[in-house]
Amino acid sequence: MTRFTRLALGLSGLIASASAAGLAFTFAAPASAAKPAPGRVFELRTYVALPGRLDALNTRFREHTLALFKKHGMENVVYTTPQDDKDGKADTLVYLLAHKSRDAAKESWTAFGNDPVWKTARDASEKDGKIVKSVTSVFLDPTDYSPMK
């Protein structure tokens, strides 16, 4: 399955999960990668776990990552997994973060990556081997008609 296909499937799963929860999201790609729009941005991230490691990934997020994201200024919006096997149910985590700006996102990710608490949690969660096979990230701007901005 290609990276684009996984991203599209992840986004469709996110939308389906949001719809089931009574939420409505509308996304648009940034106009220019070279010049990010000012203001709040969303980041859609898709993690593909190594075979049999999704539970370990979910545990790491549940017990450590969400709190660390918040500590470093990232807003946890929604965390989802696909419902169907063909969409990566066994190994895929898709989540949405909100950042004050694209620059703030960069600063938050740098601080998160350098946080000794994160390094300890990551190393402990990988004591039985690596967890993540791949990560994709897409920054999104809400449209002018999006109920969530």
Which sequence ranges carry the predicted segments?
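Active-site-flanking beta-strand signature of metal-NTP-handling nucleotidyl enzymes
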Residues: 42-46, 94
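Short, solvent-exposed loop/turn elements at beta->coil junctions and helix N-caps
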Residues: 80-85
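Short, low-complexity, Pro/Ser/Thr/Gly-rich segments in the mature regions of secreted, periplasmic
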Residues: 141-148
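Short, surface-exposed ligand-recognition loops at beta-strand->loop->(often short) alpha-helix junctions
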Residues: 49-58
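N-terminal signal peptide c-region/cleavage motif recognized by signal peptidases
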Residues: 17, 28-29
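Bacterial N-terminal signal peptides that target proteins for export
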Residues: 1-21
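A short, glycine/Asx- and small/polar-enriched loop/turn
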Residues: 87-93
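An amphipathic, aromatic/His-enriched active-site/gating alpha helix that lines ligand/cofactor pockets
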Residues: 11, 25, 32-38, 59-77, ...
